[in-house]
């Protein structure tokens, strides 16, 4: 009997010590938006980031449109009186763009791997009060990744962006390439995580694939015009929405599936 009483008291003390789930969550960047939308109850979400309704940046824009977005974050956060603010870490235990307040803060760095995405899902799920929901999301993503078809073709790919910027190693895009059986051209050229590669150097390198953002297919300025050079146009393209790769999150599986399918279906050179 004594043991039961002690166990009951211990359980009560742990429950009492745990903070109540937040009732007013504010997200300060698009990356945090994805986690909040996937893991929090709708009634818990007070506001999303300024770009929460931007289809080029938000992978969950259809769901996000139900919620207000911030226009002047510093002012509006104070007015909203949230009990949890999520965004990029500021290096001092706070969140970038969050004014001082008594609310809890969770800083999430940019996820550069599926392992980081899993960890962040766990963090967000725990702090919003739905750890089981986070576990289910992780399990579902792992199951979907395990079910992806084995890549049929390898090759060298370059994630080439407007103004000649190429995404390098140690990034989310680099891991997605490797998952699709592709070698990142940046690794072969010894480039860092982000480097500007002149058009002439890209033409000389002749990768087997160019991975481009869907939004860059239209020529809107000189930065996008270079992606339409005749030699580059002859290289098979893998088109991926920027919203799938700008942040780590639940869209990781969609990005991996799409890259594998497009690489396998591309014409041989």
Predicted features along the sequence, with ranges:
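Bacterial Sec-dependent signal peptides at the C-terminal "C-region" and cleavage site
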Residues: 12-22
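Structured C-terminal subdomain patch of bacterial secreted/periplasmic proteins
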Residues: 23-24, 115-126, 135, 213-269
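A short, structured surface patch at a secondary-structure boundary
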Residues: 24-80, 84-94, 182-185
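Basic- and aromatic-lined ligand-binding clefts that recognize polyanionic substrates
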Residues: 24-36, 132-180
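Short secondary-structure boundary segments
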Residues: 29, 89-90, 162, 189, ...
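His/Asp/Glu-enriched short active-site or ligand-binding loop at hydrolase and phosphoryl-transfer sites
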Residues: 49, 55, 172-194, 236-239
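Short helices/loops that flank or line small-molecule/ion binding pockets
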Residues: 74-82, 196-206
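Extracytoplasmic ligand-binding site segments that recognize negatively charged/polar headgroups
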Residues: 93-96, 109-123, 156-175
């Amino acid at each position: 009997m004594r043991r039961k009483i002690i166990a009951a008291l211990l359980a009560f003390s742990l429950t009492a010590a745990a903070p109540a789930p937040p009732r007013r969550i504010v997200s300060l960047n698009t990356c945090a938006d994805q986690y909040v939308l996937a893991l929090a109850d709708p009634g818990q979400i007070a506001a999303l980031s300024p770009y929460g309704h931007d289809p080029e940046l938000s992978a969950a824009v259809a769901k996000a449109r139900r919620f207000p977005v911030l226009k002047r974050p510093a002012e509006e956060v104070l007015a909203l009186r949230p009990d949890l603010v999520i965004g990029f870490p500021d290096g001092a235990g706070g969140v970038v763009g969050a004014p001082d307040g008594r609310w809890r803060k969770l800083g999430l760095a940019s996820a550069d791997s599926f392992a980081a995405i899993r960890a962040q899902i766990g963090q967000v799920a725990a702090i919003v009060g739905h750890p089981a929901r986070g576990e289910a999301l992780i399990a579902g993503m792992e199951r979907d990744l395990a079910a992806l078809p084995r890549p049929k073709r390898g090759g060298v790919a370059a994630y080439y962006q407007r103004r000649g910027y190429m995404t390098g190693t140690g990034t989310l895009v680099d891991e997605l390439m490797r998952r699709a059986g592709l070698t990142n051209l940046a690794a072969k050229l010894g480039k860092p995580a982000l480097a500007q590669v002149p058009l002439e150097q890209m033409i000389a390198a002749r990768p087997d694939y160019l991975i481009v953002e869907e939004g860059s297919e239209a020529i809107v300025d000189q930065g996008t015009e270079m992606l339409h050079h005749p030699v580059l146009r002859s290289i098979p393209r893998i088109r991926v929405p920027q919203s799938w790769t700008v942040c780590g999150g639940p869209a990781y599986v969609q990005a991996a599936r799409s890259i594998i399918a497009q690489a396998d279906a591309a014409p041989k050179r």
